[in-house]
């Protein structure tokens, strides 16, 4: 699984600035999705071919006893426990603060690799910036400027060397012999453990720990209707005898790792509860990761017709950026609707792995343009000439032509819908990339 880097520090030391710098390339993928809440504190970064998850823990007050500061401290401690590397950020402008010492005392006891980072160091000599912070006993401070990017690349490369050293080798994500890897995600008490047990049945369970990290993940292999699947543990499912029960602890880190590791994600919602920001955050990360998705609305049997209509309207309004995914209204406890849910899992995986021939893609593109041309931007109208597939899981369609920077987001969504309809790409995010032609004769004739 992707390693996790937790950003820790007292308020206003620049954690969010560093987070935004580390994750900006990923944020761009979901920036224009309507209905998506943007105030996330977790995301993906990438250096070369090495992806990683990064968690901004919020301002850390380790001695807070109650209220919102206590809750923030609890969440921070959990993130630190589950991180591969902790980046402890201090403020080079304001110098060493008593809170820094308290946080350092706590971090030393965790046993986690700690990178002490002095932020806001632009324009200052290293000795002037670093001297005070040696007192924390966390080794040599690394001076950076999150706002300007100075020192950030070197720091994150060092952190990733440590983080990846503890990661086990992973098998090919798309190896068909392993079966479809499914992550069932959702906030606490939506019925994840009930759905797991409904899917696997008590007599077909093979559970084993994958060693190699301090957070061993449980993978459960099972067959259903002759097809192989692997369930990935998400947020505290643990085997108790022959069934799985949910430990009452929601882990953002485990959820993000499971989404990243999966072929298909089942986002489980509680029909009897309004959709929350947390649901939207999880859904946004699924889209950002490009994972195939099926929505399960659980506890449907407990609603009357009026409540069902209200729940459907809530889903449409708050998660409209998931309109590519099928929704199923189920009861995990009564095992109703699960067959259709799993058929959509199969369909979503098939769509994510679909091979799209260049001639058919180009024909679909030409037909879409003939039906509705892109708008002009000033005197220029984009010319879309041909398309080919640039990747799978999720499908990437690369469109070639001229003046493609003038293509609007509205027209891009129009093309996406046309491709989805033509190739039955339900259940998977779809990426479209425009590449302007370098052919000097492209506009001739």
Swiss-Prot record:
Keyword tags: GTP-binding, Nucleotide-binding, Repeat, Ribosome biogenesis
Family the UniProt entry places it in: Belongs to the TRAFAC class TrmE-Era-EngA-EngB-Septin-like GTPase superfamily. EngA (Der) GTPase family.
UniProt binding sites for GTP 2: 186-193, 233-237, 298-301
General function of this protein: GTPase that plays an essential role in the late steps of ribosome biogenesis.
Alphabetical list of HAMAP family matching this protein: GTPase_Der (MF_00195)
Domain KH-like: 354-438
Name of this chain's protein: GTPase Der
Listed Pfam families: KH_dom-like, MMR_HSR1
InterPro entries linked: AAA+_ATPase, G_ENGA, GTP-bd, GTPase_Der, KH_dom-like, KH_dom-like_a/b, P-loop_NTPase, Small_GTP-bd
Cross-referenced CDD domains: EngA1, EngA2
Gene3D superfamilies: 3.30.300.20, P-loop containing nucleotide triphosphate hydrolases (3.40.50.300)
Subunit organization: Associates with the 50S ribosomal subunit.
PROSITE patterns given in the database record: G_ENGA
GO molecular function: ATP hydrolysis activity; GTP binding; ribosome binding
Residues reported to bind GTP 1: 9-16, 56-60, 119-122
GO terms under biological process: ribosome biogenesis
Disulfide pairings: none
NCBIfam families, A to Z: GTPase_EngA, small_GTP
Keyword rRNA-binding: no
EngA-type G domain location: 3-167, 180-353
SMART domains: AAA
Keyword GTP-binding assigned: yes
């Amino acid at each position: 699984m992707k390693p996790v880097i937790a950003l820790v520090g007292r308020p206003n030391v620049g954690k969010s600035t560093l987070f935004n710098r580390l994750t900006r390339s990923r944020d761009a993928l979901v920036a224009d999705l309507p209905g998506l809440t943007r105030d996330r504190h977790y995301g993906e970064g990438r250096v070369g071919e090495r992806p990683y998850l990064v968690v901004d823990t919020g301002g850390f007050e380790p001695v807070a006893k109650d209220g919102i500061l206590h809750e923030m401290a609890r969440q921070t401690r959990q993130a630190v426990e589950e991180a591969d590397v902790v980046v402890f950020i201090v403020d080079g402008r304001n110098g060493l603060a008593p809170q820094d010492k308290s946080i350092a005392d706590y971090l030393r006891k965790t046993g986690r690799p700690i990178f002490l980072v002095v932020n806001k160091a632009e324009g200052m000599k290293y000795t002037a910036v670093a001297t005070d912070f040696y007192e924390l006993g966390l080794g040599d401070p690394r001076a950076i400027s999150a706002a300007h990017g100075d020192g950030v690349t070197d720091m994150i490369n060092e952190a990733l060397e440590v983080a990846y050293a503890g990661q086990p080798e992973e098998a090919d994500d798309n190896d068909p012999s392993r079966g479809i890897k499914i992550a069932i995600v959702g906030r606490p008490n939506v019925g994840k453990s009930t759905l797991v047990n409904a899917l696997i049945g008590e007599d077909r369970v093979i559970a084993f720990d994958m060693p190699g990290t301090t957070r061993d993940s449980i993978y459960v292999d099972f067959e259903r209707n002759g097809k192989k699947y692997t369930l990935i543990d998400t947020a505290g499912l643990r085997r108790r005898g022959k069934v799985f029960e949910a430990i009452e602890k929601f882990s953002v880190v485990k959820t993000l790792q499971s989404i990243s590791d999966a072929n298909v994600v089942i986002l489980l919602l509680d029909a009897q509860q309004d959709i929350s920001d947390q649901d939207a955050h999880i859904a946004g990360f699924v889209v950002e990761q490009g994972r195939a998705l099926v929505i399960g609305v659980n506890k449907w049997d407990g609603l009357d017709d009026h409540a069902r209509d209200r729940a459907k309207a809530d889903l449409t309004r708050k998660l409209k950026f998931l309109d590519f995914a099928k929704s199923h209204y189920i009861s995990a406890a009564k095992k109703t609707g699960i067959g259709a849910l799993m058929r959509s899992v199969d369909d979503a995986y098939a769509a994510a792995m679909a091979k799209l021939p260049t001639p058919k893609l180009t024909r679909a593109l030409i037909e879409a343009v003939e039906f509705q041309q892109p708008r002009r931007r000033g005197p220029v109208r984009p010319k879309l000439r041909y398309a080919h597939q640039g990747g799978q899981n999720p499908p990437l369609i690369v469109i070639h032509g001229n003046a493609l920077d003038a293509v609007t987001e509205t027209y891009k969504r129009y093309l996406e819908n046309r491709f989805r309809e033509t190739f039955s790409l339900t259940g998977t995010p779809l990426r479209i990339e425009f590449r302007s032609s370098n052919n000097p004769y492209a506009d001739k004739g």
